[in-house]
Amino acid sequence: MGTLFANLNSSANALAAFQRSLEVAQNNVSNASTAGYAKQVPTLNALPFNLQSGLLGGVQSGAPQSTRDEFLEQGVRYQTGLLGNFQAQAQSLAGLEPIFDVTGQTGILASLNSLFQSFSNWSASPDSVAARQDVLAKAQDLGASFQQTMSVLSSASDSIDNKIGSTVSEINSLASQVLDYNVRQAGGGPADAGLDAHLHDTLESLSSDAGITARFESDGSVTLLLGGQTPLVIGQRQYSLSAENFDTGTPVNANARPTAHIVDASGQDVTANVTSGTLAGLLAVRNSVLPGLQGDSQQPGAINLIAKKVADRVNQLLASGLTPGGLAGVALFNYDGTSAVMAARTLTVNPSITTDTLAALDPGPPQVANGIAMALAGLGQSKAGTDTINGQSIQDFLNGQTQILGQQSATATANQSVAQQAVTQAQALRAQVSGVSLDEEAIRVMELQRGYQSMSKMISVINGLADTLMQMV
């Protein structure tokens, strides 16, 4: 009778083990689409078998085993960081490309071409009032184009500053979730597949925002580092980041927009540690591309160089000429010359100039009635040293800036496409190891159900034998 009840107990243990295994499989199916979830594998542990000691063997359910591979997780995070970087660059640069219309139909290039054409028309009819009025009108259009372009660039900088700030806030928020995980780990308790899934989903989101390194410690906690160096979370302490704008060197240009920086909890500049993720892409455009166009404390920017060169050379040529009344010419353009970054945003037509004070005559010798107007008409393509910017004609320099921006945008877009493919491949490789296959789980459930049914039948048989024996007593 004792052996019968021992077999009943062994069968009950096996039944419970199969039940627990079925629950694990069901949990896998339920979380097949849960972000960060790794497939759990049920375990069955053999019980000791020794008839002399009354140990009849059997099985019991063990703790489910996770199939997560941290090496593969690290690979996904790395590729996700690269994608975030190139994606942020591509999106930001795509917003800047319309500023420089390569067709020459709009923007600075169109206005500049129109001004030079008005000079050409004026040179053909130097005494024409209509031609002179057209010169003044086209000069006003050019000033407005420069101001509009600088306004768009300034708005782009503001937008990126806001995105940098929101990204830093998101990083701090996600880091606080890692901190919460560490606090729970310190409290002990069994492994939690849901908590583990949330942690790895958080780490992947952090990688998309910035290049982070996650180190799993022996006590179960996670150490989080920015760029492998700057601590974000260590144990049960969080170190928050902040975004600030300031210049690190002595400013050469007054009234320039300061550089964007990332500062750690101790106030140290850790911008150099931001090497991937959305934050890196935003910083690249904010601190490199935009200053190259609108200038900063150390450089005037391409747009200001063009505005200053056009204004200075036009004014110099007009000042060297004579009006129809024999008076010296006056400047066509005004701009704020107190800082190299102010030329384009302040470029306007001299309010004192009129059609009568436009000087087309070159006093020579020899005197040429339309000499100044002709020189102005050819200014855009002139290779003379005083007419060039960095060795290029004004129009060639502007076209070059347009091409540079277009190439930067195309490169970022191409890199984004490659990075997206790499992320997809890394995720697919991870899914092969730790992803949930519904077909595989269906087969496992069928196998476990058969085992469960067998144990149920065994228990039913033992119960029947026990009842029979009890009736015989």
Language-model region placement:
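Structural signature of extracellular appendage/secretion-system components
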Residues: 1-473
